[in-house]
């Protein structure tokens, strides 16, 4: 299965394993809660999936790479204890708590979450001394004499033997106690994730043209050459930061992430062209509605991959604006909700209490900061979610400063001041939405003049539809031309499907 399907199955499993009956007991007894065993090539996204599932299910996550552990840290350290059995005093060996089990309790204490996921990576690559412990863990859900706490779902991951020489096969007794999922690389599924994760547009455009270069692991006389989904994502993060700093990514740098020389060389050459197209065509000028006439003449002679790269650049510029608009929306919505709670709280204060409004607001802001920190430590915030809360914190702190400087005479005056601050924020949100909408209209003007209803327009409209950032913006704010083109595309798809059905029916009748 692909990683998206595996994520859905793990999410459903967590919900099922943590479901309780009318008496408050787990509906599926712990002994029947089979651990999940994910088997797949390295760098496919197994660890990230666990982070997403934990965040979306609202549970804690404790993750370990078991190859970093010795038997002592996994099982615990031995010590001697005196026992009295029958009429004899004897010395027996006991063990301290496993470091892994202890980390679960530490996570519960730090986050306040009593339920979670224990994720053990590279479980089939352990040393010979630790192998029996891992078998016991999968079969009995214990490390040494310490059981995994109730309410914690066990997920383990490993690599097939063709990817790792250290792999140990599990026997049938162990496999009969786990739920095994075999995961394969899937570019279309990864692209869905990549759009939501804001993966660099150059990578997505390149992989659209060269899908065979998404994931490869090849062994030859020179060693192992490979490129993985993890490599592409990590490179994307670096490229984003390099662009912000005005730094140039060269071929040597790319080879540090894409450890397949031919693919690294190919992508490096494409990236240089990608940046060249951005500058030559003036993407920002196009989105400002100021496309140069020479651009249209050049496109008439341009090969398809160049035209497709330009479409990708336009989409990247739009998505930056859509994301800014969405972020402004999220911050404004959160501040509005906060302001409503402040209004309720202010109504409970005596109007003549000195500095009462400022003190109350400061306490509310401090509580918001503490909740952000709690969710951050618990791993319950996505990257976008964390950015939103941090921006809200900064905005609220600014309001707090304005409120203290104003020295409001009463609660009503304090609230009016805060409402004025929010109005400025609402105006900023409106500007961000207008900027994005204007750029979208300019992009459609350019696309219609340059490509009309060609394949490039199909790609443009399709990407606007499938990208969650653009889709959310269009759903909220609309765009008449987008909806018209999207409707025409759907009609064309239905017509093509009907023609295929008719052709198949004719072939069947012709064969009779």
Regions found by a protein language model. Give the residues of each.
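Conformational switch/transducer regions in large eukaryotic molecular machines and scaffolds
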Residues: 35-37, 57-68, 80, 89-116, ...
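AAA+ P-loop NTPase catalytic core and its hallmark functional loops
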Residues: 1-212, 220
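Alpha-helical lid/collar subdomain of P-loop NTPases
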Residues: 196-355
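Terminal-proximal interaction/regulatory segments of ATP-powered molecular machines
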Residues: 300-512
């Amino acid at each position: 299965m692909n990683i998206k399907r595996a994520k859905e199955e793990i999410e459903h499993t967590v919900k099922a394993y943590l479901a309780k009956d009318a008496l408050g007991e787990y509906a599926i007894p712990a002994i029947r809660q089979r651990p999940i065993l994910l088997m797949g090539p390295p760098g496919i996204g197994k660890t990230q999936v666990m982070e997403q599932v934990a965040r979306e299910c609202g549970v804690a996550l404790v993750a370990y790479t078991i190859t970093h552990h010795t038997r002592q840290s996994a099982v615990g350290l031995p010590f001697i204890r005196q026992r009295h059995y029958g009429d004899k005093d004897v010395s027996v060996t006991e063990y301290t708590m496993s470091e892994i089990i202890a980390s679960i309790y530490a996570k519960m204490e730090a986050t306040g979450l009593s339920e979670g996921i224990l994720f053990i990576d590279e479980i089939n690559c352990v040393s010979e001394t630790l192998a029996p412990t891992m078998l016991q863990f999968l079969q009995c859900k214990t490390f040494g004499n310490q059981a995994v706490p109730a309410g914690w779902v066990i997920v383990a991951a490993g690599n097939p033997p063709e990817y790792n020489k250290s792999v140990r096969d599990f026997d049938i007794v162990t496999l009969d106690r786990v739920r095994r999922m075999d995961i394969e690389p899937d570019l279309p599924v990864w692209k869905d994730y990549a759009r939501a994760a804001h993966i660099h547009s150059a990578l997505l455009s390149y992989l659209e043209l060269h899908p065979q270069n998404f994931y490869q692991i090849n062994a030859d006389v020179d060693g192992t050459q490979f490129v993985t989904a993890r490599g592409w994502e990590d490179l994307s993060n670096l490229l984003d930061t390099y662009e912000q700093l005005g730094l140039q990514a060269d071929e040597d740098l790319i080879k540090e992430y894409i450890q397949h020389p031919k693919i690294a060389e190919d992508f490096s050459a494409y990236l240089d062209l990608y940046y060249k197209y951005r500058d030559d065509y003036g993407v920002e000028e196009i989105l400002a509605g100021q496309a140069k006439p020479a651009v249209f003449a050049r496109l008439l002679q341009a090969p398809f991959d160049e035209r497709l790269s330009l479409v990708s650049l336009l989409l990247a510029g739009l998505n930056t604006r859509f994301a800014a608009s969405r972020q402004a929306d999220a911050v404004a919505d959160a501040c509005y909700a906060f302001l409503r709670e402040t209004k309720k709280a202010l109504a409970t204060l005596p109007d003549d209490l000195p500095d009462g409004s400022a003190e109350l607001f400061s306490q509310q802001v401090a509580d918001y900061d503490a909740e952000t920190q709690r969710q951050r430590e618990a791993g319950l915030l996505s990257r976008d979610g964390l950015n939103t809360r941090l921006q809200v914190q900064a905005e609220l702190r600014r309001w707090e400063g304005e409120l203290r400087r104003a020295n409001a005479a009463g609660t009503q005056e304090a609230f009016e001041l805060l409402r004025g601050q929010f109005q400025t924020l609402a105006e900023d949100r409106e500007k961000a939405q207008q900027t994005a909408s204007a750029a979208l209209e300019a992009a459609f003007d350019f696309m219609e003049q340059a490509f009309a209803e060609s394949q490039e327009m199909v790609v443009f409209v399709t990407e606007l539809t499938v990208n969650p950032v653009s889709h959310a913006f269009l759903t909220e704010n609309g765009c008449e031309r987008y909806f018209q083109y999207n409707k025409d595309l759907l009609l064309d798809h239905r017509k093509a499907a009907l023609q295929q059905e008719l052709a198949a029916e004719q072939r069947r009748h012709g064969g009779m």
